[in-house]
Amino acid sequence: MILLLGLSLVSLGALSFDELIYKDEVKPSFDCSKIKDDGKSDDELMICNEIGVRNEFENKKLALADNIYSSLYQNISKKADKKIKKDFKAISKKMIKERKICIKNMQNTKAGENPILPLLNASDCMQEAYAKALLELMQRAKKDTKTKEVLEQIFKNKVDKYENLLTQSLNTNKDLQDFIDSLAKEDLIDSRAKFKF
């Protein structure tokens, strides 16, 4: 009886994907008011829901993915040496470059094409870029004792489970919803999708 009560109380603080996504506004890790509409930051404008407003649900998902990614990056970077930090930065630069390619591909819409399809494709493409980068960060962090320790603490010793969810997402062309939902339900992230570490 006491065990059941304890489990019930633990789950009270946990969220779900639905609770995260259906908030009025989901803010990414960066300040949207500072992003310029100059054609160079369209990936960030989409995450901020300034581009593709008809695609708000998917844009919110991108903001959640952005928060998870930046939170993981910041937490594991604190214990990383210069070489590993350099590797982490390279992973981030690659991910940002991939995000920008996703937006460029969206802008190549053909006349008569359903206008929502390019937005959905861009969102899927950007989620894939985040999934790849998250997986690469985790795999690189596991190769170093200090960052591996932090990674295990962040994921409460379930790193393999979350690597598998990311791999499944990439192998099945699914979005990050299951990954985010699992993080939320296991109380690893807060209401902004930042790790509670």
Which residues are covered by each model-predicted region?
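Classical Sec-dependent N-terminal signal peptides that target proteins to the secretory pathway
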Residues: 1-16
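N-terminal alpha-helical modules
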Residues: 15-197
